Amino acid sequence: MNNPDDLIVITRFLRQQHVLTLCAGSGMDMWCANCFYVFDEAKMALYLMTEKHTRHGELMQINPQVVGTIATQPRTVALIKGIQYRGEITELKDDAELIARQHYCRRFPVAKVVSAPLWQLNLLEIKMTNNTLDFGKKLYWSRLESQ
């Protein structure tokens, strides 16, 4: 069962960060990419911009199931905070794309001059390590358990 206190810490972390590692795969072909993201707390989703013709973009179109990480870069192990996630990604279209693009461009103004597609990564499962709470402390969230 999801712990509401865990979710508070997880969502705060997701709001504070802006770069994720996205890993996509199909069969034995896998690829990772770093992308800027905007967090939509109400939907527990991340919006990101990337081209369809990239290696990870092509893989996401074949298999929308993705995994990845979001992490800080602390100088000491006691300050490590990071998320491992599993999700499903879809290219946004029509009104959903326009709304997400407004949020994305507000956070990253340089994106206003880029015409790359916007994607919605619906988070399905999160495991967060937060050594600032306790060494090796793990926090969890699952979409299935929140429904």
UniProtKB/Swiss-Prot annotation:
Residue ranges of the TM segments: none
So which domain of life are we looking at? Answer: Bacteria
Spell out the disulfide connections. none
Recorded family membership: Belongs to the UPF0306 family.
Q: What is this protein called?
A: UPF0306 protein YE0465
Taxonomic source organism: Yersinia enterocolitica serotype O:8 / biotype 1B (strain NCTC 13174 / 8081)
